[in-house]
């Protein structure tokens, strides 16, 4: 096996290839957590108090300056709950810098569905935008240097690709997506191998 030299473009491309399936899975899991173990909007008993044919219009506004991330997760939440019955109007794109009190997006659809999906959608937006915003802060501090900001595998379970995508939106770069991407010899590998030399030689041969 030939060791792979770090290539941020290859990491980014690999992430973008995986992300569609991971978005679907992550959203489904989050909705199941709210809806009694299955993706069924009828399990939101509070939303069922509203008239079935009622429709609403909602505007999501940011509370503070930052970097937006999470568009496709928001859309997937409502697609899984209501197919194409929710309409989106987007005022920002992933990676855009936003100001406090700026409208991010608007939703129009069944009132029950908007209320059922609201918290799940916002959880994704807040988490991913928070990561993107913090990454951008450090990237800006490093501007003018040759230093590149990389992420790690220390991510929330089930959200690996989402959080690494947020890093890209903030201007950072991805390191390893998983253990199969590249060798990374750390203290425990050295201890188990017997020496740094043995670990490195094994990686090359």
Regions found by a protein language model. Give the residues of each.
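Acidic/glycine-rich phosphate/pyrophosphate-binding loops and surrounding catalytic core
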Residues: 2-205
């Amino acid at each position: 096996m030939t060791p792979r030299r770090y290539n941020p473009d290859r990491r980014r491309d690999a992430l973008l290839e995986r992300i569609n399936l991971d978005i679907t899975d992550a959203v489904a899991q989050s909705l199941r957590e709210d809806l009694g173990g299955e993706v069924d909007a009828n399990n939101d008993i509070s939303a069922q108090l509203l008239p079935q044919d009622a429709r609403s219009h909602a505007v999501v506004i940011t509370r503070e300056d930052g970097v937006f991330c999470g568009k496709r997760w928001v859309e997937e939440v409502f697609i899984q709950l209501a197919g194409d019955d929710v309409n989106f109007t987007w005022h920002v794109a992933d990676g855009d810098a936003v100001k406090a009190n700026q409208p991010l997006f608007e939703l129009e659809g069944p009132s029950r569905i908007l209320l059922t999906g609201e918290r799940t959608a916002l959880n994704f937006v807040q988490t991913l935008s928070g990561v993107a915003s913090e990454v951008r802060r450090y990237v800006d501090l490093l501007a003018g240097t040759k230093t590149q900001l990389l992420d790690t595998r220390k991510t929330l379970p089930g959200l690996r690709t989402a959080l690494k995508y947020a890093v890209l939106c903030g201007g950072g770069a991805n390191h390893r997506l998983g253990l199969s991407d590249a060798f990374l010899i750390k203290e425990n590998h050295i201890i188990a191998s017997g020496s740094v030399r043995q670990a490195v030689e094994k990686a090359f041969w």
